[in-house]
Amino acid sequence: MPRSTRYMAIQLYDSLTRTLKPLAASQLDGVFRFYNCGPTVYAPAHIGNFRTFIVNDILRRLLELELGADKVHHVRNLTDVDDRTIQQTRKEGRPLAEITAHWTAKFHADCDALGCLPPHVEPTATGHIREQVDMIECLMERGNAYRAADGSVYFRINSFPDYGALSRIKDRELKITNEAADSDHKDSVSDFALWKAYKPEEDGDVQWPGPRGAAAGRPGWHIECSAMIKKHLGETIDLHTGGVDLLFPHHENEIAQSQCCNGGTTFARHWYHSEHLLVDGTTMSKSKGNYYTLSDLTAKGYSPMAVRYALLSGHPRKQLNFTLDSLHAAERALKTLRNFRAKLAAKPASDLPSRTAETSPSSTRASEPAPTKGVEALFNALHDDLNTPAALGALFTLVNRGADATDAPSLADFDRVLFALGLDLSEAKNVDQAAPEIPAEVTALAEQRWAAKLAKDWGSADALRAQIAALGWAMRDRKDGYSLEPQN
């Protein structure tokens, strides 16, 4: 895979092997094939969902910067038929397509506000019924699936010896999911539905002709991703991502379906899962009712960019406790970044440092100046398992040195940093009119101190806290981050 020598290669934790591995395109065309599970469009996505989508967005941006936009193919699906969408149609008394179209539009608007690039392809489950039926018939022909007495079709888990490799779940430990109510129709309680026979009292008018020998009905949840990946990306993809809640059973089932239908071909060469967002120490979810939507937060006066920034403040593979205090800190940080960029933009061209790039024949950026050490540190942090808190720490180290420093980044390099993080600085919203203005120097020191704490560099963390105190501010640690308050 051709790459620039400007920064270290992108490496990412692989949930299957439990190791850090470099990302690489596997096909001869050099195109990196990347899939992430999208939303179920029956209600607004909450910011816990968007944490995962923002993580995927940063991955997409880094890959495009590294390989070129034409060498990345990103697919994200929309689940527009499943138990929850159908339940919502019964609840509202409206057609399925009308409800899912409404929430799809809302999801797209929120993604745009949060700065997420749209996928290259966004297939829907209802738009790929034929592909799902074809895959189910393939599995039935190969003996991996069977028709139950009620006309449904189930995947026979014991036909796939590698089942559980991703989640490390053994057969005796398999969860009995909410499909257990249909266990009378299964060969084994752990088998999962590929096709659900039509039930008039539950499904209303939602049904399609089934696979050969099966009843009319609708696809199960898991088969859609396998079918859409095969159609739009092929039998083997380079990266599959999603939230940790999808690791089992959804992603485990995808592997089983795809590899059985495709003759054992590796389904995904790399798996990455982001962790839960917490509220008051509890996982944020619609079922618990303890969630924020983007609209909830913008109604309180916070900008979408502040939400994005706050969600970047914790490592994607670690749980992050979300608070409104973190949004206040994010708004202030964004203001500091705006001011810094304005100073860079105002510098005469003659003041810009002259640097020579280290290049190789494979580099696509041979004519660009070499990045400053600060910019290099930031990208290396992102390339090292998406270490976003370390990247933000490196960003504010740059800012703290000042726009006039001899090693200040060029405006082009700073804009490349902003692109990688997906931070749009064009909007400026003051959500804390009564709060005293925090000096840029204090904010920068606080970001550095937080990064030092995360790195367990206690000596540096204590020294930075003392510097903050000397400037008249108290930095108070919280589970999810920190707050800054003027000292009395």
Model-identified regions with their sequence ranges:
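Structural preference for alpha-helix termini/caps and helix-kink/transition segments
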Residues: 283, 291-488
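N-terminal, positively charged nucleic-acid-binding surface of large information/translation enzymes
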Residues: 17, 22, 27-115, 484
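The substrate-binding groove and active-site-proximal loops of carbohydrate-active enzymes
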Residues: 89-96, 120-126, 243
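Short coil/loop linkers at secondary-structure junctions
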Residues: 70, 95, 117, 236, ...
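Short, glycine/charge-rich beta-strand/loop segments that flank catalytic centers
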Residues: 78-81, 104-107, 117-132, 150-159
